[in-house]
């Protein structure tokens, strides 16, 4: 039976490249001269930490991160910006989580949407992905189009299309 998987995977190397590009841009921009703005990326914990001298520079770094994500073809929906917190010496810090995988709630929404479409396919949740199987490839392509039209808050990729 034909099937495919719905996943939400981020390329951590591309996120690392984005952070490095933003670091270079911060080092060369005139308005960041003399400010101790720092960015660091933790691949193991999949998080980015930003340390800036004030809120304006924090917003500028956030905009640079989003712009570089688009430029490097990393969906900005993968980034989950935390609250701005006060740090030592009058600086501000923010933690940015890099979301990877489909949460249980999102997977349930996807399955519910597929079942509500009345297409002759079955959807099953497997860890952080959803497997969709059906008798016809046309039905599977209709499901892909249905899921692309809706916004689930996470970027979706469709892999392992088997016939």
Curated annotation (Swiss-Prot):
Its biological purpose is as follows: Nucleotide-binding protein.
Q: InterPro entries under this entry?
A: DUF520, UPF0234-like_C, UPF0234_N, YajQ-like_sf
Name one matching Pfam family.
DUF520
Name the family: Belongs to the YajQ family.
GO annotation, cellular component aspect: cytosol
Range of residues in the leader sequence: none
Alphabetically sorted, this entry's keywords are: Nucleotide-binding
Task: State the protein's name.
Answer: Nucleotide-binding protein Dde_2479
Q: Which GO terms describe its molecular function?
A: nucleotide binding
